[in-house]
Structure formats: structure tokens, C-alpha cells
């Protein structure tokens, strides 16, 4: 990593408040005068410059401040006004928090873009960028097409809020992140404004926010099929609405990577470029596993200069899709760097990629996996931690029905989304099919390549839940997540099919497995022919100077990141997860910020109704010099019976040790599809 200290422009920065033209959050009702908290880094110049916007609910004054310091000053040093804004009701912005990506959030974002374009220091052209939430709302606001917005960079984001976000996968409830992200956001939304920025009104603002809080899990579980709630904010509903130029980036170890493939397929090829590396849910320049990282800031600068300054940087002469194809590698939960190479495709679907079907062999087989199948799935959102990625899949394969295809004289290189067709007979109304594609080495080790899920009630569409006729046989087809991978000669391609996948997938009530008939079933691989690809090069990762946050050493031993405990007598499996969100850090202005979280996922081997989840969060914000000391403690739980999901959430907030807010929510939500 190169830390850059000299730039074409000197820079300055300031914190400001951006006035909105009126209206407030959905929770707050009508009104006006709301101001959003913003930090602006600008080049020292008399010439107007384009503005770049990053718009998040994650607190610019502390939580994202270290990451912001790596990027925004860098852009300012290259001649852009780089702007970081807190979403309404979060951080130091006024107003009350609303739902995830709600209409008010997007309308506010459009208003901010117009405000930026009107400033005397702005050229009138605006770009927008972000990762995850910021990548989502960059796409969503681009679909609203505000005139000043000319280009976006969207990283690790999704075009489909139902089938490619943290809530559902293949029509099934994503137990692991439906729960974990709802619990995380419950803690996050309860964090107070900082009196160092907003003054004495902080507590009044905080209490009003807390009164408006409703756990996200209620809404998410109330919508178990793809309905209008999920269509809002899903740009796949109308790709043509996006007028801005789109650079879409993702990683093969990020759950949102298929969005890059769909964007380069459906957007005007003269206005989009895609980039998929080996990365996790991180910016590609941060140097976090798995690498190799790239000079992503430099790459985005080419994009901004091309579309906001009318400079021909050559970025539109790059292939439509640049992607990393990994070489075969042994299973491990973390890789510093993966072996492989960059390839370029000038169209997508690519003329270099052809579907090759591999027929499954054998007679009918029973697929009735124990409920703990999936404990070796790895983390849904890998961030580069030591226990994030799936370990050796042999134990998972043993709980599945597997089919193997030898790789003989030539390597088989795949790029895109594999597809399976399974001929299934089932005696119960509800169930799930999970397909995993593995690379099996001569020594028997099994590396997970990709996977896919289908809620069998969603086989006719994600917008409905159709019971399976008892004893009926049907062919079902579904895609696995996209991947770039090479299977070498001497290895075997393994398709492993299971009927459960905990804790990723919430088990269906009454699940009893199914019979898989190999006749008529196949796996279809997107095989890329061997071509002499043009050389694809990126600069080395580069960032601006770090903020100077201190992470105090501790004598306490850290909890394991992922601990699996088996109670043999009870037949119960419990996974304890420490998501490693940051621990304690001390900021240059004296703020002490502490986060601690632990997630627990429990299930019994033969009882789908035994599944339960729990998350406990503690967040403390402390300024020793002023005595300010705010503490947030939350508990979030989900369980289910045959007919309902059962949720329980609790929030306790303290000011200097005194409880100022305490609320518990208990809710039963009908199981309509999940």
C-alpha cells in the first residue's frame, strides 16, 4: 500500500449542514427545515470542480471516519470536491431514521445532489460512489436520474433487494444475515448524535430518534415474497431508468457480485463497465484478504475524469467486463492472495463463454440432510477476517448427495453463473434445495467454488409461494452465484445437493428432504474458452494518509471468530460468531468508541423447528474530557414454530449510567413462504 502525501492540489476540509427543501422521514411525518450533516474536502482552486458524493447512515464523524480519510482527501487532491453526508436520522444529521433505502432517503439524496451542483465551487457535475449501502443508494438515486448526476461508482451493491440482498436467497429466508443485519442496524440506529458536533441538543435529538425506532426485522419478515416493498429500490425493475455512467465493482467472495454481471448485461454498453476481483466485501484497494488488491482509487479517477471532466482517460476502451479467474487452491478460511489472472470480455453474455451441461448419473437418491448441514458455509459477508471463508467441504459433502465429473487432459475454466436442473420428488408441501459446486483435489480436499439455493415453494417465481403437491415429481431449475474459477486436470468437479443449509438458510417447517432423480438432472457450467486475452493491468493500491485512530492493546484474549459447539447427547449444534466490528478505538479528537457483538445460531440435527438465533450488541461512545458517556445495549432473537416466526428485540440506552430509554418488542409473524 502506497500512502500518498503529495497531490496536484492542496486541499481543505470543513463540516457543514446541508439544508433540505422540506419533508421529513416517513416516521416523522410532514415538516421541513431538516439539515443533513456533511464533511467536504475541496481542492484549493478558484476554478469550479465536480463534486463526488458518498451518502451513508454510518456516522461520518466516527464510524466511517478512518475509511473516509483514505478516500475523500485523495479525490480532493486530484481536483474534486469530495463530500460525505450522513443520512437523515443518523450520525449528526437531523430528522428521524426511516426504513432501509426508503423513498425519503432517496429523495434527500437527490436534493443533496442538486444542492451540490448549485454551489459556486462546483462545476455543476456530480458523481456518486459507495460500497454496500452507499453502492445501493448510488444505483437507486441514479435510477431517479437527477440531471447533475453524470456518473457513479457502485461497489459491492445489489440491483435486486429481494433476491440478492441480506434478506432472502432463492426465495428462502437468509437466517444468518436477515437476523445479523437487522440486529446490527438496531444497534446502529440507536447511536446518539455527538455533542461535540451538535451541541446541547444531542440528547433531545437522541430521545426523539429512539422513540421512532422499530426493528427492521418486522418489516423484512412481513414481506416473504418479491412484492412491491422489495421492488422499490431494486433497479433491476427498470435498468433503462439509469442515465448516469456506471462503474460497477465487486468481488467473487462478496454475496452481491452477480449484480455486476447483470448491470453489464442490461445497461447500455457505452455507459457501463464492470470489474470483479477475488475480493471480499471491501473496497479493492484496502489490501484485505483475499487479494491481490488493485489501485482502485486510481481506476475510479479515470472514471471521474472521463465523465465529469471530459478527459479521454481510455477507461471506455477497456473491456466491458474485467474479471479475475482464480486458479485452483486448497480450502482455507482466509487467503492473503489467490492465484489467478485477469481476463477481459467485450460483451456480456460473452462470446467467449458457452454453457456446457454435465448430466447427473445414477438412480433416484434420497436427499435428507441433517439440519446442521451448512456450519462450514463460511460467513455470508466476508470482510477479510481469519475465519470468514468456507473450510474444507468434505464434512458438508458427506451430508449431501454428490455427483462428480473428472477433469482430464485440459483445464476447465468457468466464468459466470452455473445452473442446475434437478428432478425432485417430495412428499411434503415445503422444502429447500441447496447446490454447491466444489473443486476436489487428488488428496480428497474439497474447495467450495460457488453455491445456490431454491426455496421449492418459489420454483414458479419469487413473487409467490406454491406448495409442492404431495408425492409429485417436478423439474426445478436455479442458478448458482457467479464465479471465475479454473479446475485443473486431475481434479474432480463435484456437485453436492443438500436439503438444509443452516445457519445461512432458515429451515422450512416440516422439512423432510426429497428424492433426487439423476435422470433428467444436470449441472450447466459457463465454460470460457481459452483465449489470448489482452493484458489487463492495474496500478498498485494507493490511499491518502490514515486518520490516526488508535486501537488500544488489551490483555484479554479475543473470542474465536466462529466457534462451533456440538452437544452430542441433545443432538444440538451451536455456532457462536464474533463479527469483529472494531472493538475499542480512540479518535484524534479524544472520542473513545467501543463496539462488541456476539451472534449465536442454534439447531438440533433432526428438528427444523429448533432453529433459533440471538445477537447481543454493546456500543459505547465516551469523551473523557467532557464526561459524555452514552451506552447502547441491544438483544435480538428469532425462533419459529410451524406457522409463525417469533421475534424478540430489546434496547437499553444509558446516559452516564442512567437509563434514558428501555423498550422491548415481541412479535409473531406468519410464515407465508419462509
Please report, for each region that a protein language model flagged, where it lies by residue.
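Active-site-adjacent alpha-helix of alpha/beta-hydrolase-fold enzymes
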Residues: 258-272
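Cap/lid segment of the alpha/beta-hydrolase catalytic domain
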Residues: 44-117, 166-167, 435-442
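Alpha/beta-hydrolase fold nucleophile elbow
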Residues: 121-132
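C-terminal, loop-rich substrate-recognition/catalytic regions characterized by aromatic stacking residues
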Residues: 275, 283, 289-654, 658-674
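N-terminal cap/lid segment of alpha/beta-hydrolase-fold proteins
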Residues: 2-46, 408
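Accessory cap/linker subdomain of secreted extracellular hydrolases
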Residues: 68-69, 77, 143-241
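Glycine-rich nucleophile elbow surrounding the catalytic serine of serine-hydrolase chemistry
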Residues: 131-140
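Short beta-strand/loop motif that positions the catalytic acidic residue
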Residues: 242, 248-250
Amino acid at each position: 500500500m502506497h500512502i500518498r502525501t503529495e497531490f496536484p492540489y492542496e486541499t481543505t476540509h470543513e463540516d457543514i449542514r446541508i439544508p433540505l427543501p422540506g419533508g421529513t422521514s416517513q416516521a416523522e411525518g410532514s415538516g421541513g427545515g431538516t439539515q443533513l450533516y456533511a464533511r467536504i474536502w475541496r481542492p484549493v482552486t478558484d476554478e469550479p470542480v465536480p463534486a463526488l458524493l458518498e451518502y451513508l447512515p454510518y456516522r461520518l464523524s466516527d464510524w466511517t471516519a478512518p475509511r473516509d480519510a483514505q478516500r475523500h482527501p485523495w479525490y480532493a487532491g486530484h481536483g474534486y470536491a469530495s463530500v460525505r453526508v450522513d443520512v437523515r436520522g443518523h450520525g449528526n444529521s437531523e430528522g428521524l431514521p426511516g426504513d432501509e433505502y426508503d423513498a425519503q432517503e432517496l429523495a434527500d439524496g437527490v436534493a443533496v445532489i442538486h444542492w451540490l451542483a448549485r454551489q459556486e465551487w462546483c462545476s455543476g457535475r456530480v458523481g456518486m460512489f459507495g460500497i454496500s449501502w452507499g453502492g445501493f443508494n448510488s444505483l437507486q438515486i441514479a435510477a431517479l436520474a437527477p440531471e447533475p448526476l453524470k456518473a457513479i461508482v457502485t461497489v459491492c451493491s445489489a440491483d435486486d433487494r429481494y433476491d440478492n440482498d441480506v434478506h432472502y436467497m432463492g426465495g428462502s429466508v437468509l437466517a444468518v444475515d436477515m437476523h445479523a443485519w437487522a440486529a446490527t442496524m438496531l444497534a446502529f440506529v440507536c447511536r446518539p448524535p455527538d455533542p461535540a458536533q451538535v451541541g446541547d441538543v444531542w440528547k433531545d435529538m437522541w430521545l426523539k430518534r429512539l422513540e421512532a425506532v422499530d426493528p427492521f426485522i418486522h418489516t423484512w419478515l412481513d414481506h416473504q415474497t418479491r412484492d412491491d416493498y422489495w421492488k422499490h429500490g431494486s433497479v433491476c425493475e427498470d435498468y433503462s431508468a439509469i442515465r448516469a455512467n456506471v462503474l460497477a465493482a465487486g468481488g467473487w467472495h462478496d454475496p452481491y457480485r452477480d449484480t455486476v454481471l447483470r448491470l453489464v448485461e442490461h445497461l447500455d454498453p457505452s455507459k457501463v463497465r464492470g470489474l470483479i476481483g477475488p475480493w471480499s466485501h471491501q473496497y479493492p484497494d484496502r489490501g484485505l484478504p483475499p487479494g491481490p488488491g488493485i489501485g482502485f482509487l486510481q481506476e475510479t479517477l479515470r472514471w471521474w475524469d472521463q465523465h465529469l471532466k471530459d478527459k479521454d482517460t481510455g477507461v471506455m476502451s477497456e473491456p466491458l467486463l474485467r474479471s479475475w479467474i482464480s486458479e485452483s487452491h486448497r480450502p482455507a478460511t482466509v487467503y492473503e492472495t489467490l492465484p489467478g489472472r485477469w481476463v477481459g470480455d467485450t460483451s456480456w453474455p460473452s462470446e467467449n463463454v458457452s454453457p456446457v451441461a454435465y448430466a447427473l448419473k445414477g438412480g433416484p437418491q434420497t436427499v435428507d440432510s441433517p439440519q446442521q448441514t451448512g456450519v462450514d458455509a463460511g460467513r455470508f459477508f466476508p470482510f477479510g477476517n481469519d475465519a470468514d471463508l468456507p473450510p474444507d467441504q468434505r464434512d458438508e459433502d458427506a451430508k449431501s448427495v454428490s455427483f462428480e465429473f473428472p477433469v482430464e487432459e485440459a483445464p476447465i475454466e468457468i466464468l459466470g453463473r452455473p445452473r442446475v436442473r434437478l428432478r425432485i420428488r417430495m412428499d411434503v408441501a415445503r422444502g429447500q434445495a441447496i447446490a454447491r459446486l466444489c473443486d476436489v483435489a487428488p488428496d480428497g480436499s474439497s474447495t467450495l467454488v460457488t453455491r445456490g439455493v431454491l426455496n421449492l415453494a418459489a420454483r414458479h417465481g419469487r413473487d409467490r409461494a406454491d406448495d409442492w403437491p404431495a408425492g409429485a415429481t417436478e423439474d426445478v431449475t436455479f442458478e448458482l452465484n457467479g464465479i471465475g474459477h479454473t479446475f485443473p486436470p486431475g481434479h474432480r468437479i463435484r456437485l453436492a445437493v443438500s436439503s438444509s443449509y443452516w445457519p445461512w438458510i432458515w429451515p422450512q417447517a416440516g422439512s423432510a428432504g426429497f428424492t433426487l432423480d439423476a435422470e433428467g438432472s444436470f449441472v450447466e457450467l459457463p465454460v470460457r474458452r481459452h483465449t489470448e486475452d489482452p493484458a489487463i493491468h492495474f496500478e498498485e493500491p494507493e490511499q491518502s494518509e490514515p486518520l490516526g485512530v488508535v486501537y488500544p492493546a488489551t490483555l484479554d484474549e479475543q473470542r474465536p471468530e466462529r466457534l462451533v459447539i456440538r452437544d452430542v447427547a441433545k443432538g444440538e449444534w451451536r455456532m457462536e460468531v464474533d463479527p469483529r466490528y472494531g472493538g475499542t478505538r480512540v479518535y484524534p479528537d479524544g472520542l473513545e468508541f467501543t463496539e462488541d457483538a456476539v451472534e449465536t445460531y442454534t439447531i438440533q440435527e433432526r428438528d427444523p423447528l429448533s432453529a433459533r438465533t440471538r445477537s447481543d450488541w454493546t456500543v459505547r461512545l465516551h469523551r473523557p474530557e467532557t464526561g459524555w458517556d452514552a451506552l447502547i445495549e441491544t438483544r435480538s432473537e428469532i425462533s419459529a414454530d410451524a406457522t409463525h416466526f417469533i421475534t424478540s428485540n430489546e434496547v437499553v440506552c444509558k446516559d452516564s449510567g442512567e437509563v434514558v430509554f428501555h423498550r422491548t418488542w415481541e412479535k409473531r409473524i406468519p410464515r407465508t413462504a419462509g
